[in-house]
Regions:
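Gly/Ala-rich beta-loop-alpha elbow adjacent to hydrolase catalytic centers
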Residues: 139-141, 145
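C-terminal catalytic histidine-bearing segment of alpha/beta-hydrolase fold enzymes
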Residues: 237-286
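The feature captures the conserved acid-bearing segment of alpha/beta-hydrolase catalytic domains
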Residues: 162-165, 169-248
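Short glycine-enriched nucleophile-adjacent loop
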Residues: 146-157, 275
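Residue in the alpha/beta-hydrolase core beta-strand immediately N-terminal to the catalytic nucleophile
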Residues: 136-138, 163
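Serine-hydrolase catalytic machinery in alpha/beta-hydrolase-like enzymes
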Residues: 27-43, 50-136
């Protein structure tokens, strides 16, 4: 009886420390047919039936913990579980295209590494791990993470994202006839009209910094990317306008928003502040 009682006390303490925390934590996710991946996360003060989930997708720097730290400060008073997967460079060099192609346009043949549906797999894992009742999630990505976000919402089977922010992407998959990854011609997986309709009818906020106009080695200069505009600012504007034209021509439902963040260049911290006003709106506070 003494052993059982001590065991129950220890178990309770372990559960309590897991469910009540404001510190960054990490797990190694291996429940798929791809290389294992580090996932950083931060639990709210207390998980309740109103706890929401926000995924934070890093840029090409791959510093998922740094991105999460920015959002921990922004969401410090909110009942939200923050999750930041780390797509390391060695295992997922082209995470920004969902591992479906290189940035120069060459299609990757190993479909086992494709990252469509990955976020929803993580979503289900965290829902089960912490006994959450979340039916959907929100997602933010900056730079390469912004590329990931919009392609993920386009090419995944049935993403449960209720709201998304794609900020300062270097280039896009336009909804026109250019070959994938620059357009939707000949994608490496099936892409139907239902995918496109759902994509356009998802609340996606395209954010671009007013000063994100610098062209350097970090900006994709391939022919396919340059056809989208000279810099990130032009490409974001053109991406949104092409989508708007398609919606008007085909009388489709459209929930996208376009926002210029004044004074911001290629800065995740500044774009995160703007995104937080969108994603944290109406969330429960402590």
């Amino acid at each position: 009886m003494v052993f059982s009682f001590r065991y129950l006390i220890i178990s309770f303490l372990l559960v309590s420390s897991t469910i009540h925390s404001k510190d960054m934590e990490k797990l190694v996710f291996s429940e798929w047919n791809k290389p294992e991946i580090n996932i950083f996360y931060r639990l709210p003060n207390k998980i309740t039936e109103n706890t929401k989930i926000i995924f934070v997708i890093h840029g090409n720097s791959r510093n998922a913990d740094g991105y999460l730290n920015v959002w921990m400060k922004l969401a410090n008073k909110h009942n939200v579980l923050l999750i930041a997967p780390e797509f390391n460079r060695s295992s997922f060099p082209s995470y920004n295209t969902l591992m479906m192609s290189t940035s120069s346009g060459r299609i990757r043949e190993n479909k086992d590494l494709y990252l469509n549906n990955s976020i929803d797999l993580f979503f289900e894992h965290f829902n089960e791990k912490f006994g959450l009742e979340a039916r959907n999630y929100m997602i933010y990505g900056h730079s390469g993470g912004s590329q990931f976000v919009h392609r993920y919402l386009l090419l995944s089977d049935n993403p449960k994202a209720s709201k998304a922010v794609a900020a300062n992407a270097g280039w896009y998959t336009f909804l026109h006839g250019a070959p994938y990854p620059y357009g939707i011609k000949n994608p490496p997986i099936e892409l139907t009209s239902a995918h496109i309709r759902r994509f356009l009818n998802t609340e996606i906020h395209i954010l671009i910094g007013s000063e994100d106009v610098k062209v350097d080695s970090s900006v994709n200069q391939s022919d396919g990317a340059n056809a989208q505009g000279r810099n990130r600012f032009q490409r974001a504007n053109n991406f949104f306008n092409v989508a708007t034209d398609i919606v008007e021509e085909n009388n489709l439902d459209f929930k996208w928003k376009y926002q210029i963040v004044n004074g911001a260049a290629h800065s995740n911290s500044k774009m995160s502040k703007a995104a937080a006003k969108i994603l944290l709106k109406d969330l429960e506070e402590w």
